[in-house]
């Protein structure tokens, strides 16, 4: 945390990371109330990613009181190349959550065409595309491919947990179930705390029965107040 505070003196990234540390319960207590104020300070310092994030959160009412007009004003004010690109990323989420999935997909496809190969934002776009797919429509392989592409760029992204879950639940993907356990654990160490519950619950199954491990992982899930989802 002290490192974040030192970085925050000259970079908004420090403020954003400070908020993330609290939201991820790195210090034994998860407190999401820190997230928006810290990101807002990062945005005020001109950190492009935070500027777009705050615009989206304010528009949707995530981690703060909803104010669509303020969110729109912030979206319109995005000016740096980084902020504009992240703004498009969040615009796609806004379209998706208001029911316009086709427009969200088009925004993401256009954004991928615009972003250079290897850009970190590409990983987030691929992950979002995977999350948006409906497994009920038989798009499991396509969803897994999106997560795999995201992890090629950012190996510790949150999509680790989702990919592991697909590998575990859908044998048609051709992946051994043991691999899912490895990836869930990797996701945990990357800060995806809900992965603990997947490990805890599945270590209770007869095929993988290991009660000490099940208890250990369920306790970790409880520590961070994560639901099994």
Where in this protein do the model-derived segments appear?
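Alpha-helical tetratricopeptide repeat
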Residues: 1, 85-95, 119-121, 125-128, ...
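Hydrophobic face of amphipathic alpha-helices that form TPR/SEL1-like repeat modules
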Residues: 18-24, 53-60, 88-95, 129-135, ...
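Short helix-capping/linker turns of helical repeat alpha-solenoids
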Residues: 4, 9-14, 24-26, 44-48, ...
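Residue-level detector of the short coil/turn that links helix A to helix B
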Residues: 26, 30, 66, 99, ...
């Amino acid at each position: 945390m002290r490192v974040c505070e030192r970085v925050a003196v000259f970079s908004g990234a420090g403020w954003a990371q400070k908020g993330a540390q609290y939201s991820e319960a790195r210090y034994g207590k998860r407190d999401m109330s820190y997230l928006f104020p810290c990101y807002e300070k990062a945005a005020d310092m001109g950190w492009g990613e935070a500027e777009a994030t705050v615009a989206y959160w304010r528009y949707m009412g995530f981690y703060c009181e909803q104010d669509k007009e303020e969110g729109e004003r912030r979206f319109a004010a995005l000016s740096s190349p980084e902020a504009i690109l992240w703004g498009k990323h969040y615009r796609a989420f806004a379209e998706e959550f208001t029911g316009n999935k086709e427009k969200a997909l088009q925004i993401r496809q256009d954004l991928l065409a615009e972003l250079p190969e290897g850009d970190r934002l590409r990983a987030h776009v691929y992950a979002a595309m995977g999350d948006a797919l409906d497994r009920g429509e038989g798009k499991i392989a396509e969803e897994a491919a999106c997560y795999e592409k995201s992890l090629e760029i950012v190996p510790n992204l949150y999509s680790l947990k989702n990919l592991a879950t697909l590998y575990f639940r859908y044998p048609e993907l051709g992946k051994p179930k043991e691999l899912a356990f490895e990836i869930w654990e990797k996701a945990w160490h990357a800060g995806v705390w809900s992965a603990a519950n997947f490990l805890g619950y599945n270590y209770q199954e007869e095929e993988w029965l290991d009660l000490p491990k099940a208890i250990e992982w369920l306790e970790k899930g409880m520590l961070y107040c994560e639901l099994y989802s």
